[in-house]
From Swiss-Prot:
Main function: Component of the small ribosomal subunit. The ribosome is a large ribonucleoprotein complex responsible for the synthesis of proteins in the cell. Required for processing of pre-rRNA and maturation of 40S ribosomal subunits. Part of the small subunit (SSU) processome, first precursor of the small eukaryotic ribosomal subunit.
Biased composition (Basic residues): 101-119
This protein's name: Small ribosomal subunit protein eS24
HAMAP family attached to this UniProt entry: Ribosomal_eS24
CC terms in the record's Gene Ontology section: cytoplasm; nucleolus; ribosomal subunit; small-subunit processome
Source organism superkingdom: Eukaryota
Sequence positions bearing N-acetylmethionine: M1
One Pfam family hit: Ribosomal_S24e
The UniProt record lists the keyword Cell wall biogenesis/degradation: no
Organism: Bos taurus (Bovine)
Region annotation (Disordered) ranges: 90-131
InterPro entries given in the database record: eRP_eS24_sf, Ribosomal_eS24, Ribosomal_eS24_CS, Ribosomal_uL23/eL15/eS24_sf
Length: 131
């Protein structure tokens, strides 16, 4: 599958403020299925001489008729900057962020406690009970 897949970048921009390089990625894959994001990350890592863990690709859309897919990619200078600037859902896709999930019962109890008070007191109730 790797032999006829071409990756091109355009609208390349170095964003010094967020310590990253950002670009539009065109993937040419005639007669083949859409290329997995992991494979795109690995190929970009080779192109830009970095590791795949600091590369974030998203928003890929395959053009009508297939053969060409376009998306967006960002290469951070380090993993720390990526964790600081990337949205949590994108970090979760890489396994860098785990959302803490409260139980359904706890969420319902909190909601019902919040309904009983009005105004600024909601902040105290929402924080939870002090022990």
């Amino acid at each position: 599958m790797n032999d006829t897949v071409t990756i091109r970048t355009r609208k390349f921009m170095t964003n010094r403020l967020l310590q990253r390089k950002q670009m539009v990625i065109d993937v040419l894959h005639p007669g083949k299925a859409t290329v997995p994001k992991t494979e795109i990350r690995e190929k970009l890592a080779k192109m830009y001489k970095t590791t795949p863990d600091v590369i974030f690709v998203f928003g890929f859309r395959t053009h009508f008729g297939g053969g060409k897919t376009t998306g967006f990619g960002m290469i951070y200078d380090s993993l720390d900057y990526a964790k600081k600037n990337e949205p949590k859902h994108r970090l979760a896709r890489h396994g860098l962020y785990e959302k803490k999930k409260t139980s359904r019962k706890q969420r319902k109890e909190r909601k019902n406690r919040m309904k009983k008070v009005r105004g600024t007191a909601k902040a105290n109730v929402g924080a939870g009970k002090k022990k």
